[in-house]
Design a protein with these regions (language model features):
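Catalytic cores of Mg2+-dependent Asp-rich isoprenoid enzymes
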Residues: 1-157, 162, 166-277
Length: 277
């Protein structure tokens, strides 16, 4: 199996919405974004699937060394072998790839966030940076496009946090800011014990409104001349925002279920967004 095939398998196996946005890219850009996404999956799985925290830290440290070595032409993993040829072509910065690893390590260091600023820092590491790297691969001609991608990544992560509140709580992680839980009278025990209430719905409506605003702010930043090149990101946005709308329409019943879109619906949204340009 070639490095590119390994990354393709990694990306397709995840069933992620991101995979659908890659379908319409030219081959070279598709290989680059697939390698980037495979890297994100590798380091994310390191934290999510490793039951021993010390081993997870060792693996993340290995990835830091591997990324640094990749920028010197010394890569050993199929993902870095697939990603390395694209570093210069798409101006992919080492600091951004390392920041993603830092974000994964944050999940080992803390399970609660005091306020929105603290949660936003986490979102920047695990999602906004990915947005910046992705936009560079898609083709960004303006600094404003990278700002758009940074904000869009933030909106994606806010959507993930809303969708996965119950699942994350069962893993011992609560990303919703402590001060906002207190503001709406919702406790950590409510989340852990899946106590759906009017207060919880109000809390989630507040979170949803903020995520919707983040999408609007992102779209307002995208320069017209880059809109066509950034269609993959817009496809992701169409899928993620539809998911957010579904969560809201379902009354925020996210404590006991994980709401998702069917593959055929994702494909339809991808095609519709691509055609509209």
């Amino acid at each position: 199996m070639s490095p590119d095939e390994y990354c393709q398998q990694k990306a397709a196996a995840s069933g992620s919405s991101f995979y659908y946005s890659f379908l319409f890219l030219p081959p070279e850009r598709r290989r680059a974004i697939t390698a980037l996404y495979a890297f994100c999956r590798e380091v994310d799985d390191t934290v999510d699937e490793c039951t021993d925290e010390s081993i997870a830290r060792i693996k993340l440290a290995w990835w830091r060394t591997e990324i640094s070595g990749m920028y010197q032409g010394k890569q050993s993993h199929p993902v870095t072998q697939a990603l390395q040829p694209h570093l210069t072509v798409y101006n992919l910065q080492e600091q951004h790839l390392l920041a993603i690893i830092d974000g994964m390590e944050m999940d080992l260091n803390q399970t609660r966030y005091l306020d929105y600023a603290a949660m936003s820092k986490y979102c920047w590491h695990v999602a906004s940076v990915v947005g910046i790297l992705s936009a560079s691969i898609f083709g960004a001609t303006s600094p404003e496009t990278l700002k758009y991608a940074e904000k869009l990544g933030h909106a994606f992560q806010l959507t993930n946090i809303i969708r996965d509140v119950g699942e994350d709580a069962r893993k011992g992680r609560i990303y919703l800011p402590i001060n906002e839980l207190q503001q709406f009278g919702v406790t950590a025990a409510d989340l852990l014990n899946a106590r759906h209430s009017e207060k919880f719905e109000q809390l989630m409506a507040f979170q949803c409104a903020r995520a919707q605003a983040a999408y609007d702010e992102a779209f307002a930043l995208l320069p017209k001349q880059d809109r066509r090149a950034q269609r993959p990101g817009l496809i992701m946005a169409a899928i993620y925002r539809t998911l957010l709308n579904e969560v809201q329409a379902d009354g925020f019943h996210v404590l006991t279920q994980r709401i998702s879109l069917t593959p055929i619906r994702k494909l339809w949204l991808a095609w519709k967004t691509y055609v509209r340009g």
